[in-house]
């Protein structure tokens, strides 16, 4: 369904120091990193898409988080949700919702919410039932 998701960032090195470990916890692989542009991209599935990309805005203006915009990363387990949230907060993220069940979405939805150092709202969610 999606080709890519692009998030604007203000400090490339700071963003890399945040996203590399958080996405690694989720098993998402870095596909490219070009500091001269600067931009970097990750993918979780074999093949060219979908991509998650961070970069300074191409128009050179200051990045602004969207009001009502959120990127949600899939986690295979609830432990991954917990680990990603804890790691993100240790790297400077701001908590927007602690890990937990959210049955208002569906019976097995387990998610956590936070904002990256640029204020972009992110979620890590597991949709699997506990066996």
Q: Residue spans of the language-model regions?
A:
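N-terminal beta-strand motif that seeds the catalytic metal site of vicinal oxygen chelate
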Residues: 1-16, 71, 127-131
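Short secondary-structure capping/turn micro-motifs that flank functional sites
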Residues: 38-40, 104-105, 130
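Long, continuous compositionally biased terminal/linker segments
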Residues: 40, 44-83
